[in-house]
Amino acid sequence: MTQPRNLEELGHRIAIQDLLTSYCTAIDNKDFDKLDDVFTPDAHIDYTSAGGVKGAFPEVKDWLKKALGLFPMTQHLVTNFEIQIDGDQATSRCGFYNPMAIPESSEEGAALRLLYFGGYYNDKLTLTSDGWRIEQRIEDTAWKDAQFPENSD
């Protein structure tokens, strides 16, 4: 990994790390409109390695609302940032660890089953007038320990 050349580049790296963390916070708080501050309006997102969808940001955002609505608890953590900046474009690869809880049944007060996912977010970013935004995300799920309850879709 090349070292940052100046304070401006350090600022960009910190801004990108903050953006990636903002994604996690928005997802875990189920504040999906905050994702508008993370992705470009025309971003392409691919979650298929984890069994999710692939498509344009607006459609994926709607899918996230529905899919993550099944989970009363999620915790998305990102680490090991590899960021390359070239002017107003950048690429990033970071590791993620994601424990999630899903009810064992549809009964009120059902016990929660924990599921665990780990892998990498591979992103292309662009610097806009509002700051850095992800224009492409490909999730690469490296492993999972996840047995969904029989009643879940």
Region roles according to the model:
Residues T74, L114-Y116:
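Transmembrane beta-barrel outer-membrane domains
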Residues M1-N29, D33, D37-P41:
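Short, low-complexity N-terminal intrinsically disordered segments enriched in polar/charged residues
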Residues N6, L10, G51-K54, L112:
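Charge-dense, low-complexity intrinsically disordered segments
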Residues E104-A111, S152:
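Short, surface-exposed loop/helix-turn segments at secondary-structure junctions
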Residues L20, H76-N80, Y120-Y121:
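Short structured motifs
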Residues T91-R93, Y116-P149:
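Short beta-strand edge/turn micro-motifs at domain boundaries
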Residues F32-I102:
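A solvent-exposed, acidic/Ser-Thr-rich amphipathic alpha-helical stretch
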